[in-house]
Amino acid sequence: MNNVTEFILLGLTHNPELQKFLFVMFLITYLITLAGNLLISVIIFISPALGSPMYLFLSYLSIIDIFYSSSIAPKMIFDLISENNTISFNGCMTQLFTEHFFAAAETILLSVMAYDCYVAICKPLHYATIMTQSMCGFLMVVAGILGFVHGGIQTLFIAQLPFCGPNVIDHFMCDLVPLLELACTDTHTLGPLIAANSGSLCFLIFSILDASYVIILCSLRSHSSEGHLKALSSCASHIFTVILFFVPCSYLYLRPLTSFPTDKAVTVFCTLFTPMLNPLIYTVKNKAVKNVIKKLWKQIMTTDDK
C-alpha cells in the first residue's frame, strides 16, 4: 500500500546566503557542462577529421553526460531558491530511473572506450577490421540497452515498496538509500539486492577497465619510446575520466546501505562537476580536437568580418 504522493527534499543546506552562492555556482557549472559537451558533440559530428571510433565514442559520452547531468541538476538548482522543495512520487521514480539509466550507460561506454584503446594499441593491424562503423554502432546500442535495463530494475524494485507515512528525504534528489530508509517494510533483505545491482555493475566494469589497462601497459613494453609516449597520451584522458567517475561511484554504492553526510557533496561532484570536466579532459592535450576548434573559430571570425 502506498499513501505517499510526494516527497519533501531537504536539499543541500538551509543557510539562505549559502543557497544563493550555490545557486549561482551550480547554474554556471551546469551551463558550462551543457555548452562544453554540446560543443564536443557538434564538432565531432561535423568534422571528417574526427571520424575515428575514439571520437565517435567521445561524442556519445558527451551526449550521455548532458542527459545524466540534466536528470538531476535543474531540479537541484531550482530548489536552492524555491520554498517548495517537493517532488511527486512519479517524478521521484522518473528521476531515479533517468539517473541510473544514464549512469549505467556511461559506465558501460567507458568500458567500450577502454576496449577501443586496447585494440588500437595491442592489435593495430586489425583495428580497422575490428572497430568498424557497424561494430561501434552496435556497442553504443548495447550500452544504451543495458543502461535502460539497469535503470528499469532499480526503479521497479523501489516503486513496488510501500511508502505509508514518512516522506522527508534528507537529500536534494531521489536515490536508492534515502528511499529505502523511508519504506514501510523490512528492507534488510531487499535493500542489499537493490544496492548490489549498482554496486556489482560498478565493481565489474571497474575490474574490466583495470584488467584492460594492465594488458595495455604490458603490451607497451614492445613499443618504441616514441610509440610508448603516444599510446600513453591517447589513454591518459580516458584513465582520468574513469577515475573521476568510478571513485565517487564506488564510494556511494560499494558500501553498507547507510546515509553519510558526505553523500550530497559526492553526488554533486558526480552529476555536475564530472560531466563538466570530461570535455576539458579530452581536449586539453588532444591536438586533433584543438585544431578543429581553432579552424572553426577562424571560419566564424572570417564570416563575421565579411
From Swiss-Prot:
Segments on the Extracellular face: 1-25, 69-100, 159-199, 255-263
Species of provenance: Homo sapiens (Human)
Protein's membrane topology: Multi-pass membrane protein
MF-aspect GO terms: G protein-coupled receptor activity; olfactory receptor activity
Record's protein name: Olfactory receptor 4C45
Coarse class of the protein's main subcellular location: membrane
Record-stated family: Belongs to the G-protein coupled receptor 1 family.
Protein's job: Odorant receptor.
InterPro entries recorded: GPCR_Rhodpsn, GPCR_Rhodpsn_7TM, Olfact_rcpt, Olfactory_Receptors
Pfam families with a match to the protein in the record: 7tm_4
PANTHER family with a match to the protein in the record: OLFACTORY RECEPTOR (PTHR48002)
